[in-house]
Amino acid sequence: MRLKAGKLRMWIQMFEHINNPQRVLPTLKRKNENGHRVYYDEDKNRYHSVTTVVGTIDQKGLDEWREKVGKDVADYVAIRSGITGTKLHKIVESYLANEKSEEENIFAKAHFNNIEPLLANIDLINGLETKLCSKRLGLAGTVDCIAQYKGVDSIIDFKTSSKKKKDEWIKKYFLQTTAYSIMWEELTGIKVTQIVILITGEDGSREEYIRNRDDYVEELEEVIAKYTEQ
C-alpha cells in the first residue's frame, strides 16, 4: 500500500517540553567550503558536517546507482527527496512543538501521516532541531529531536525513504545519531545512549530502529579518521 497524502490531521498540545535555563549551547554557523559543509562556533573553531562525514561510507554504492540510472534521473530523485525530507522535518517539528503546520507539500504530508503513530512514543522533549558540536570528534550538525522515546532518554532522527530499508543500508544513520549523542554529552554532561531512527517509506512502510550508541562509537571514530586523512 502506497502513501496517501490527504489532509494533515489536526492536533492539540500534547507534548511536554523540558526547560533547562542552565543549558547553554554554542552558536554555530554553517558554511560551504570547496563543496563541503562545515560549521564554525563563536571562537572560530571549525567542524566537519557529521552528515557529510558519515555519508562517505556508502558513497561507492551511490556512485554506482547514479551511473546506472543516469545523471538526470539521479539529480531529480535527490532533489525531490531532499525537498520532501526538509518539509517533513518542518511538519514534525511543528507537531512536536505543539504548533499547527500549514505545509502543503503532498509528499511531506503523506509521510507525516504515515510516521505519526510512532511520534506518540515521544515525551519530555529536551530539544528540537538543535545544533550541536564536539571538539573531540571535530564534528557538528543538527539533531532532529532529543527526548524520551518509550520512556528512555534518546537521540531521535526522522528519515524518509522510497521503500523499506534493510539494516545494512542505514549504518550511516546509526553513526550520525551516535555522533549527536556524543556531542550532547560533551556539551551538557548528560549521557544519552539510546539512539532511535524513525523511517517513513513511500511504499507505506513505517520503521523503528532502537539501538545503543556504544555499539557504534568505534566505527564512527574510524570513519572520521579516514575522512580527515583524505
Model-inferred region functions:
Residues 3-140:
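Metal-dependent nuclease catalytic cores that hydrolyze phosphodiester bonds in DNA/RNA
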Residues 130-229:
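Mg2+/Mn2+-dependent nuclease catalytic core
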